[in-house]
Regions:
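An acidic-aromatic substrate-binding cleft motif
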Residues: 155-194
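Eukaryote-biased detector of low-complexity, proline/serine/threonine-rich segments
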Residues: 1-26, 118-130
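Helix-enriched interaction subdomains in cytosolic or periplasmic regions
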Residues: 110-156
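Short beta-strand elements
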Residues: 19-55, 139-171
């Protein structure tokens, strides 16, 4: 849908010529921006803890591979003692021991404080894991990640997704392992290449100026590289010479 459902609605009844008309108005948050003036944005209701899993997708080459990642727990109120979990349990309702967190529980005393917990999972256990965190003070489980879309010309859009890591098991053979990557408008190609076993060097303007390109077996440019990097035109001839040399 184009917009999210409002957290709360205000019921209004209007009487016109003896007829009653009922409609709902979304409750909005009003604030004053020092530059833009008085603004209205949708009211967002969130749980006491927010979670974020990185990476959300993991390429698995070896079926016995141990996957490492990070789970960030953010406190949205004061004084929380949180314990990380996954939704993958054994038949006795105890957490699967194949999922290991490097911290058993975290203590967060300040609002908006965030702590990152490392985890390790055997890739052959399941195809996906969903993460949860338990508020030990309230015996409450949270499994929500907040996504935000913010542009000046539309109201902010906030929505919740489940913090998960998904495993994609593929059969791949890698050759010519050294790759140079010129970052474009923001993508996750370098991370995916590294998961597949390639050695990826990010080629910034500084790197392009000082490095010869002949040490790379391939050079990849990201999405809209020439639109996002003004300096690319200076190295056009250098890149074409790399192509010419094979």
């Amino acid at each position: 849908q184009a917009d999210v459902d409002p957290a709360y609605n205000f019921a209004v009844q209007v009487k016109i010529n003896g007829a009653y008309i009922n409609y709902l108005l979304p409750v909005k948050y009003k604030f004053t921006d020092p530059v833009k003036g008085e603004l209205y944005q949708p009211l967002v209701v969130i749980p006491s803890m927010l979670l974020k899993s990185e990476p959300a997708l993991r390429i698995v080459i070896n079926k016995d591979e141990k996957i490492k990642g990070d789970l960030t727990i953010q406190n949205k109120k004061n004084n929380i003692v949180a314990t990380p979990h996954t939704n993958y349990f054994l038949s006795n309702n105890k957490p699967d021991p194949s999922v290991k967190f490097n911290i058993g529980s975290v203590v967060m005393t300040a609002k908006d404080q965030a702590i990152t917990v490392g985890y390790e999972i055997k890739s052959d256990t399941a195809s996906a894991f969903r993460f949860l965190a338990k508020d030990n003070n309230m015996d409450y489980y949270s499994s929500s990640e907040l996504k935000e879309i913010k542009y000046d010309h539309i109201p902010y859009i906030n929505y919740m997704v489940k913090p998960e890591v998904e495993f994609k098991k593929i059969d791949v053979k890698t050759y010519n392992k050294k790759i140079g990557y010129i970052v474009g408008a923001g993508d996750k190609v370098p991370e995916s290449l590294e998961q597949m076993g390639y050695e990826v060097t990010l080629l910034t303007e500084k790197e392009m100026a000082k490095n010869g390109l002949d040490k790379f077996e391939a050079i990849i440019t990201g999405v809209r590289t020439y639109n996002t990097n003004d300096w690319m035109s200076k190295y056009y001839n250098k890149l074409m010479k790399y192509v010419e040399d094979g």
